[in-house]
Amino acid sequence: SKVDASAAQKALDYSQKALASNSDNLIATFDGGNNQNLWYGFNNAREGYMSMGKYFVDLLVNKNDPRLSYFVGEDANGGYSGSAPEDADSDASVFGNYFAGTASTPNIIVSYSEIKFIQAEAYFRLGQTLLAQAALKDAIVSSIKDVTGTTDDMYATTASATVTLENIITQKYIALFTTAEPYSDWRRTGFPNLTPNQESQTKKIPVRLITPKSERTLNANATVVS
């Protein structure tokens, strides 16, 4: 942490008391009736409303990631493509079945792979490179197992070969896609290395929710940062 120099050791200590394997994952289950998978419900009610992003899809394609076909649906041409921020590409891929295949598809809330990514970063910040690499590989292996049902040791070995903060956080971003955690990671680390939408007014990626005009007008003393 940029604020607390002891945060890495604390994160390591706490994480070692948490999930010990994929079987310990905290999962939200859905009965498929009135209680449906939220991504499924969203997509079912708004078919074609939201496409996959170009950055994420290209990242998986370029890495030949085994989770690609699970995370990303085929596009109109039978391949995998995403929309750039400034584009309205109706032919781009949509969410894959891993997230919203059926009304009863479960969602992972906290995973063993997330714990291992936390440990990988903590070890890296503590200068323990070999332990960081081992934790990073375990995190990737666990994520692939969660998503595909199989292991891919060769891919995980290659993906964990570079022990840098950027690679750790980028791999974590892939594994935790659709969760809020990668946004927090990006705000505190700057990774993954994203390019802001140059068609936007600010040409910057927001780092917090924008305060509405009514709030700034009626409660100005509490909204001076906006």
Where in this protein do the model-derived segments appear?
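C-terminal functional modules
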Residues: 144-146, 155-226
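Hydrophobic-face positions in mid-chain alpha helices that act as interaction patches
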Residues: 4-119, 125, 133-175, 180-183
